Amino acid sequence: MTLLQEVIDMPRVNEEVVDEAKVTLGDLYLLKAEPWEATLLYSQVEKSHKDSPLGYEAKLRNARLSYFAGDFKLAQSHLDILKEATTREIANDAMQLSLLIQDNTVEDTLGLGLKAYAAVEQLVFQNKLPEAIAGLDGLLERFPGHPLADDTYYLKAQLQRRTGNFAGAIATLERITNDPKADVLSDDALFLLARIQEEDVKDKLKAQELYNQVIVKYPGSIYVAEARKRFRKLRGDGV
């Protein structure tokens, strides 16, 4: 952090370099749970780089900060602008977060479930994975049947995989794949299940079976092309 601050304070340094350092320093402040310092730096970059990729990136970070803090209205105001960003990746990220907020503040108008979920996502950003998993378990207990349930299970499975709990990740994903009411994340869960079997558990036959399920059950899924490629490779087609 000291080195980044020195770059920012140096005279005659290229403005782009300074602002990139500010964004990185803002991220580090957020990792240290100092959001006010982070948003100050992001806002400076937003102001100096209006209508540019770096400025959009800073605005997206400010939107996430507002989301983490449970201020969904402010987050949405940032995201509405970013959805029109010229950078496709930023526009897509903004759209995803915007939809998450919209979808989960309709029935739960106070956004209590989403606030709990956002707090967990901040823990994930800070790499506090055991605390994040515990937070997800608490969310499932406090808000049974909440529209966020599938998102919660899916994120929990991802974190279990990252911490090496492959059996736990498989069991969690099966909560989604075995639920006939689950729809939006069903193909995501099935594809991740197949990857865990292939890459972590090393059960190639099971992975092949699951990739085939992705192809057959979800022909319109974004994962079909990759699932077909992996299925053929596991089958020994030499693709």
Please give the residue ranges for each predicted region.
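Acidic, polar-rich low-complexity tracts and alpha-helical solenoid repeat scaffolds
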Residues: 1-239
